[in-house]
Amino acid sequence: MIKISKVDERIYGSFIEHLGRAVYDGLYQPGNPLSDDDGFRKDVIDLVKELDVPIIRYPGGNFVSNFFWEDSVGPVEERPARLELAWRSLEENKIGLNEFAKWTDKVNSNMMMAVNLGTRGIADACNLLEYCNHPGGTKYSDLRIKHGVKDPHNIKVWCLGNEMDGPWQLGHKTMEEYGRLAEETAKAMKLIDPSIELVSCGSSALDMPTFPKWESTTLESTYDYVDY
């Protein structure tokens, strides 16, 4: 066999979404005899470790376009419940950003974070990045420390929204709208942490009416600022 080059391990990544029993009663089930002290199912942890998944995206999926990350951090008993519009359910925020970061450590994987560019935007993405990656001494990094997470998560890979070409997506954008929003969000985020890698949304499927023009149009705006 001739070796051409090394395959980027991130090709074999995956994602988890607050959908059905994927999170609640799936990977997270406090009180179950199979769960650890943090409420995570040990049998699920063992199976995911066996898969050797190098990177896992959070929090989805269509879910991200209605995700308010601030609701998912801090004392669990103080977190609000919200109507979850993507899958028409109730999100109680019993597990959130910091818990998922802990879970990815347990399964020997890396966390990829998606930002909400559907119903939110640039400021929210920057605040989230500051919370996750900045060491301390600022509003949101100090908030993370207050929440019991002293060291930054140092999340390397960030997704700029999810399936923004799809009319099913909350905050669906035209290719021109998304290209400009992704460009400005990327520029701002890299001012906070130049080391991050950014992923823009491509076409959701080959049969989308905007494929492949979506790619060429959005890249006219984002090419100099995104990595994937």
Predicted regions and their residues:
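Short, well-ordered coil/turn segments that N-cap beta-strands
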Residues: 8-12, 52-54, 107-111, 151-158, ...
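Aromatic- and acidic-residue-enriched carbohydrate-binding clefts of CAZyme catalytic domains
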Residues: 22-30, 62-97, 102, 106, ...
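Catalytic domains of carbohydrate-active enzymes, especially glycoside hydrolases
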Residues: 36-65, 96-103, 107
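Conserved, mostly hydrophobic/aromatic
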Residues: 14, 52, 56, 104, ...
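Short, acidic/polar
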Residues: 35-48, 96, 211-228
